[in-house]
Every structure is written in structure tokens, then in C-alpha cells.
């Protein structure tokens, strides 16, 4: 007798009852089974893999099930038809502590297993013992008679009856779907049986691994809907993260284990679930970004300040902060067009470049009715092309000092763009904007109201629709008037030097040259290193610098870093306003020190004169006193004596 038998004697059994449970999985070509199999296939063939859960009774007084490798009661299988043919598959497990004579009542000392509706294989995890069911009137399988509802009775009766499809016992028994909703299944995971593997092979539809075994159609449909509704994210091609993503290829597939608080399950997420969560979503197009009109809700349009090939630019004031912005709106719908990529490229470049004093600042972008809108910094001076047109109308030109300042500031903007491994590829007067600001001088802070402020002109680079990477260029050719010859020949080895070439021609246009040709002999002469005719006299050093910038060999052209450090641009004749202000403050400080020293010297001189005068006075006074107190010794003195008698 085992230890369990000595401590706890087996409970009394009914007449003819056995201590073991025998359950059969009956597969018959009846209509009920076919209907149930069709329902299970509709739920998804991946739900019956058995990888995610296994049967286990909570708070069961029985010991846990032994693994197949551990020593234990031997397993016996009753003869039956082959798994491939319609018939019944019977698997018996010998319960520990089985009493003798069980073979007579139940057909042998065989173990128990749960019949799983719609699974095709029984779970090897241990089910409750026979005494647990002997006192109950419910069973997970239907019995033949209303009086005998125990698992033993069902097993004995089924041995002699024909094949029947498994069905719930009676209304009190929880149905299979409700049982699944209880989520009473835990590790260890149930391995696939031969029959379930065969069914998985025959399945026509393949689901993602890791799908929950007990996910019904409503939940799975809801989950797929949620996945489809997940906000998508664009990948910025100009960020370092995008390079790492493309270089690494697909994300590594790994498994993770997490705890499900709702049912106490230690579940293992599969590879494809993680891929669905971490895989970068496809690019958001203009059509998918439609929303309520943000332009009319958040901004008040003041006027139209410009237009071009891409669209129109409007001067707007934001209702929330009251600041003025430039809103760029595409003329025609961009969804699915070639201009859509240019619009997205401009947004990507603005987001990566961030804020720089010589690059137009970017704030936000969105889509409305298939149109792209970009919120940028408002430059009150307009574009350089507008200024050149105005100068041409009044026959006035930028002076050499102003041209040097223009070249220096735009060169600093290009240096910043090139330092981010990007190239602009469309430098021209219409893409350079002017911002005029009033900056208080230090003299105003000291109380000098004659020169209280100075106008500072800032040149900023805008329109980043042609920006591309230096390492992996996707060149979209810009204006042919400012296009370098090597770019036209599809030689992209020196793309930053193409921006230098275009900048030189931009300065030439600002100097008063005639409009540049789009093609022809004059176009080729410029690509050979000949400057267009300039209607004003420039210094030889500045002219030579412009010639070097349009040299036919791109390697001979200076880089943006070398350009901003050139001696011609940093000569003493042209100093910035900040440098002049610093020198002025230094001279004022020196002047104040000299004034203080002068006052000290004057005070010292006055004190010395006062001390000298005081010394003279003291000397004169001492001489006078000495003369009055002196006596003549050895001489006769006449004294008068008066006597008054009363």
C-alpha cells in the first residue's frame, strides 16, 4: 500500500465504479463533428497548436503531472483505428494510487485525460482524480443516460456504444468557450500531438505563430482592427537612426516572457508578434494624414507673400501665441505625385537641421485635403530674388561690402548643412531669405539715446525640397541656371562643391549681372570658369574668389569651411556689427578710466596747492607772533603807574 493510501483511504465509490478514468476522443464523419471542425477552422488553425497553454486544474489536491521522461505509471493505449482514418483515438493514463479491480470496471488500469472539444488531441497535463468527479453530476462530456453522469460511467458506456461526437453534458456544465474564457491554463506548454501536427499541415491557412490558443473570433478580429489602427510613423532618411536601421536589415527576432495579470499566465510572445510591434510601419502618405482643417482653426491668414512651383506662401498669425509665421501650402494635391517625395524630403531636412541662425526655422507640418502645409519662420525682408528685382528696377546694386556679408552668412549656413552630411542642391536667390531685426546697442543701456538700436540683416537658407544625403544621394536636379556641370553629368562624388558653385552665381546675380541663361553657349562658358559681366567694379581679391568658386574642377573649389575663413571675407575693412560694438565699448571704457585718472590728478594738485598755502600762512603767523613777544634786554624801560583813590 502506498503512502497516500495509508494517510488518506480512498473515498467510497458507487457500485461498479472504478478508480481510473478512461476518456476517448471519438472522430466520426457525422455532421455535428464536421460543423464543429468548420467552426474551429473559422476561428483559426493557429489556435489549436497547443503552444500557448495547457490544461491544469487550479487548487487541485492531486500531485502535478509527471513528464514523459520521469518514471511513473506505464501508459497503455487501447487498440483502435489508425489516426489517419475516421475512428476513435483513446489514450489512457494510470492514476497514482489506482485500486485493484479497476481493469474490470473501467477497462484496465488506465489514466485519464481531458477531452478537448475541437482540439483533436488530449492534453497530457493531469486532470482531477476520479474521486473528485465521483461526487459530481457534471462531466465535460455527455453521457448516455441521465442518471449516470460520472466520468467513469461515461467511459464504461462509451466502450460499448457507437462513435459519437463529444458534446457538453447538460446546461450546468460550462461550455468550451466559457471554459476558455476562464483562462485556467498555465505552463508547462502542451506539446503538439501527432494528430494536431497533422491537422496543422493539412490546414490551408497559416496564422502567425504566438497567436493565443483560446482567442475567439471576436477578439482576434478586434485585435487585427487595433493593429490596423495603430498610428504609423515615417522613417526620416536624414537621421543617423535610419542609417542604422537600413544597415542592420530586419530586426532581430527574439522572444520575451511577460506576465498576464488578468489570468496569471506566464506567456511567451512569439517572433512574429514582436515583429508586428517593433517593425517600422510603412510611410505615411499625404492621403492618410487627412484631418480637420488645422490651418483655419489655428491660424489667421493675413496676406499672400509669395508663390512658386511648389505652392504659395502665406503670412499668418497664430491664434494661440499671436506670433507671425510663414505657411507654405502646395498648389495641387500631392498624394501619389512626384512632388509628394519632395514635400516629405523638405520636412525631413527641416526636422534634422533644427535651429540655425542662417537656416529658416521649421516649426511643424501637416496635410489637409491631400495638400501639404509647412509652418516656417517668417522673414520680414522677403527673398533675395525680390531684393535683386527691386534693385534692378531702380538701377541699384548690392555694394561689395554687402556682397561679402551675403557670401559669408550663406556660407555659414552651408557649412552647417554640410556638417550634417547633407547638401542643399538648390541654392539660388529665391531660396535665400532676408530677416531684418533691430538690436539694441550697449549705448542705449548706458543712457545714450542718440544711438539706441541698429538694423541687422540676416540671410537665411530656405526651401529644402532638394536636400539629400552626401553618402547615399538621391539627387533631384534643381534650377539649371545654377546647376553645376558635374551634377548634370551625374557625377555625385563632390556634391557639397555644387552648392559652392551655385552660391557664387547667386552673389553674381546680387552684384547686378544680367539674368543667367538656362542653356546655350553662355551657359557652357560659365561652366568653364568665366564669370558673367558685372556692372560694378569689384576688388581683384573678391573677383578671384568668385572665379575659384565656379572652377570647372570641383576639387579646386573651396569648401564651406574654407570659405567662411577666407581672408577676403574676414578683412579689417569689413567687420561685423558685433565686433564694432565690442571695440566701441572698449574705447568707452578706456575713456572713462582716463577721465577718472584726470579727476584724481586734479584733486591731488588742488590738495597740494592747499597744503602749500596753509604752510605759508602758518609761517607768516609764527613770524608775527614772535615779533610781538620779543623783549629788549639791557635797556631802560619807562613804565607809567596810575593810582586811583576813592
Swiss-Prot record:
Q: How is its activity regulated?
A: Synthesis is increased during S and G2 phases, presumably by an increase in transcription; activity is decreased by phosphorylation during M phase. Protein levels fall in M phase as a result of decreased synthesis combined with degradation. Activity seems to be negatively regulated by phosphorylation upon entry into mitosis, although N-terminal phosphorylation might also regulate the protein stability via protection from proteolysis or might regulate the subcellular location.
Which cofactors does this protein require? Answer: Mg(2+)
- Binding of Mg(2+) 2 occurs at 342, 465
Reactions catalysed according to its record: L-tyrosyl-[protein] + ATP = O-phospho-L-tyrosyl-[protein] + ADP + H(+)
> What InterPro entries has UniProt attached to this entry?
CC_SR_Kinase (IPR050339), Kinase-like_dom_sf (IPR011009), Prot_kinase_dom (IPR000719), Protein_kinase_ATP_BS (IPR017441), Ser/Thr_kinase_AS (IPR008271), Wee1-like_protein_kinase (IPR017164)
Identify the residues that the record assigns to the Protein kinase domain, covering every copy.
Answer: 299-569
What domain of life?
Eukaryota
| Impact noted for substituting residue 328 to R | Abolishes activity
Active site residues of this protein: 426
One cellular component term (GO) for this entry is: nucleolus
Q: Where in the cell is it found?
A: Nucleus
Q: Does the keyword Nucleotide-binding apply?
A: yes
Whether Kinase counts among this entry's keywords is yes
Where composition is biased (Basic and acidic residues), the residues are 158-170
Q: Which UniProt keywords apply?
A: ATP-binding, Cell cycle, Cell division, Kinase, Magnesium, Metal-binding, Mitosis, Nucleotide-binding, Nucleus, Phosphoprotein, Transferase, Tyrosine-protein kinase, Ubl conjugation
List the molecular function annotations (GO) for this entry: ATP binding; magnesium ion binding; non-membrane spanning protein tyrosine kinase activity; protein tyrosine kinase activity
* Annotated binding of Mg(2+) 1, by residue: 431, 463
Q: What modifications follow translation?
A: Phosphorylated during M and G1 phases. Also autophosphorylated. Phosphorylation at Ser-642 by BRSK1 and BRSK2 in post-mitotic neurons, leads to down-regulate WEE1 activity in polarized neurons. Phosphorylated at Ser-53 and Ser-123 by PLK1 and CDK1, respectively, generating an signal for degradation that can be recognized by the SCF(BTRC) complex, leading to its ubiquitination and degradation at the onset of G2/M phase.
Which Pfam families does its entry note? Pkinase (PF00069)
- Per the UniProt entry, what are the Gene Ontology biological process annotations, in alphabetical order? cell division; establishment of cell polarity; G2/M transition of mitotic cell cycle; microtubule cytoskeleton organization; negative regulation of G1/S transition of mitotic cell cycle; negative regulation of G2/M transition of mitotic cell cycle; neuron projection morphogenesis; positive regulation of DNA replication
Indicate where the modification Phosphoserine is found in the sequence. 53, 78, 85, 123, 127, 137, 139, 150, 165, 270, 307, 312, 642
Q: What does this protein do?
A: Acts as a negative regulator of entry into mitosis (G2 to M transition) by protecting the nucleus from cytoplasmically activated cyclin B1-complexed CDK1 before the onset of mitosis by mediating phosphorylation of CDK1 on 'Tyr-15'. Specifically phosphorylates and inactivates cyclin B1-complexed CDK1 reaching a maximum during G2 phase and a minimum as cells enter M phase. Phosphorylation of cyclin B1-CDK1 occurs exclusively on 'Tyr-15' and phosphorylation of monomeric CDK1 does not occur. Its activity increases during S and G2 phases and decreases at M phase when it is hyperphosphorylated.
* Protein name as catalogued: Wee1-like protein kinase
Amino acid at each position: 500500500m502506498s503512502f497516500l493510501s495509508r494517510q488518506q483511504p480512498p473515498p467510497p465509490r458507487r457500485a461498479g465504479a472504478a478508480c481510473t478514468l478512461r476518456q476517448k476522443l471519438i472522430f466520426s464523419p457525422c455532421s455535428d463533428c464536421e460543423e464543429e471542425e468548420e467552426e474551429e477552422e473559422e476561428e483559426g488553425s493557429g489556435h489549436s497548436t497547443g503552444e500557448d497553454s495547457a490544461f491544469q486544474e487550479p487548487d487541485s489536491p492531486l500531485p502535478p503531472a509527471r513528464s514523459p521522461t520521469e518514471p511513473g505509471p506505464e501508459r497503455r493505449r487501447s487498440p483502435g483505428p489508425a489516426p489517419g482514418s475516421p475512428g476513435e483515438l483513446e489514450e489512457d493514463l494510470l492514476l497514482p494510487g489506482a485500486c485493484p479491480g479497476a481493469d474490470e470496471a473501467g477497462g484496465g488500469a488506465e489514466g485519464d485525460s481531458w477531452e478537448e472539444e475541437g482540439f483533436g488531441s488530449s492534453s497530457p497535463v493531469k486532470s482531477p482524480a476520479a474521486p473528485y468527479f465521483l461526487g459530481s453530476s457534471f462531466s465535460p462530456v455527455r453521457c448516455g443516460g441521465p442518471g449516470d453522469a460520472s466520468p467513469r460511467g461515461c467511459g464504461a458506456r462509451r466502450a460499448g456504444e457507437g462513435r459519437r461526437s463529444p458534446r457538453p453534458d447538460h446546461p450546468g456544465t460550462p461550455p468550451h468557450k466559457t471554459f476558455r474564457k476562464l483562462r485556467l491554463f498555465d505552463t508547462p506548454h502542451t506539446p503538439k500531438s501527432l494528430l494536431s501536427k497533422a491537422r496543422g499541415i493539412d490546414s490551408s491557412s497559416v496564422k502567425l505563430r504566438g497567436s493565443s490558443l483560446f482567442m475567439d473570433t471576436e477578439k482576434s478580429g478586434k485585435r487585427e482592427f487595433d493593429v490596423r489602427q495603430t498610428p504609423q510613423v515615417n522613417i526620416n532618411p536624414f537621421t543617423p537612426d535610419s542609417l542604422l536601421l537600413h544597415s542592420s536589415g530586419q530586426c532581430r527576432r527574439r522572444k520575451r516572457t511577460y506576465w498576464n495579470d488578468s489570468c496569471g499566465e506566464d506567456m511567451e510572445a512569439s517572433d512574429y508578434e514582436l515583429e508586428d510591434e517593433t517593425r517600422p510601419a510603412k510611410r505615411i502618405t499625404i492621403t492618410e494624414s487627412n484631418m480637420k482643417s488645422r490651418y483655419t482653426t489655428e491660424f489667421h491668414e493675413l496676406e499672400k507673400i509669395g508663390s512658386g512651383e511648389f505652392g504659395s506662401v502665406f503670412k499668418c498669425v497664430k491664434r494661440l501665441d499671436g506670433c507671425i509665421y510663414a505657411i507654405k501650402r502646395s498648389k495641387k494635391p500631392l498624394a501619389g505625385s512626384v512632388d509628394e517625395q519632395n514635400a516629405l524630403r523638405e520636412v525631413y531636412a527641416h526636422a534634422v537641421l533644427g535651429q540655425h541662425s542662417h537656416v529658416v526655422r521649421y516649426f511643424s507640418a501637416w496635410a489637409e485635403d491631400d495638400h501639404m502645409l509647412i509652418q516656417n519662420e517668417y522673414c520680414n525682408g522677403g527673398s533675395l530674388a525680390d531684393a535683386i528685382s527691386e534693385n534692378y528696377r531702380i538701377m541699384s546694386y548690392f555694394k561689395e561690402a554687402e556682397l561679402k556679408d551675403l557670401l559669408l552668412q550663406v556660407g555659414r549656413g552651408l557649412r552647417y548643412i554640410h556638417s550634417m552630411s547633407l547638401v542643399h542642391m538648390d541654392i539660388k536667390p529665391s531660396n535665400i531669405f532676408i530677416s531684418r531685426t533691430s538690436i539694441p546697442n550697449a549705448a542705449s543701456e548706458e543712457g545714450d539715446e542718440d544711438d539706441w538700436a541698429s538694423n541687422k540683416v540676416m540671410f537665411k537658407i530656405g526651401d529644402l525640397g532638394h536636400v539629400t544625403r552626401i553618402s547615399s544621394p538621391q539627387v533631384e536636379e534643381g534650377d539649371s541656371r545654377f546647376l553645376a556641370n558635374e551634377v548634370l553629368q551625374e557625377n555625385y562624388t563632390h556634391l557639397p562643391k555644387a552648392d559652392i558653385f551655385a552660391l557664387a552665381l547667386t552673389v553674381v546675380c546680387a552684384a547686378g549681372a544680367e539674368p543667367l541663361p538656362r542653356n546655350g553657349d553662355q551657359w557652357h562658358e560659365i561652366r568653364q570658369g568665366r564669370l558673367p559681366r558685372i556692372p560694378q567694379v569689384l576688388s581683384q581679391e573678391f573677383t578671384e574668389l568668385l572665379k575659384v568658386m565656379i572652377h570647372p574642377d570641383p576639387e579646386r573649389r573651396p569648401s564651406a569651411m574654407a570659405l567662411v575663413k577666407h581672408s577676403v571675407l574676414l578683412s579689417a575693412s569689413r567687420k561685423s556689427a558685433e565686433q564694432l560694438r565690442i571695440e566701441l565699448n572698449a574705447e568707452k571704457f578706456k575713456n572713462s578710466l582716463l577721465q577718472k585718472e584726470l579727476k584724481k590728478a586734479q584733486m591731488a594738485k588742488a590738495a597740494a596747492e592747499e597744503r602749500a598755502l596753509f604752510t605759508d600762512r602758518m609761517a607768516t603767523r609764527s613770524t608775527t607772533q614772535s615779533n610781538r613777544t620779543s623783549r629788549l634786554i639791557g635797556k631802560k624801560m619807562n613804565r607809567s603807574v596810575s593810582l586811583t583813590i576813592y
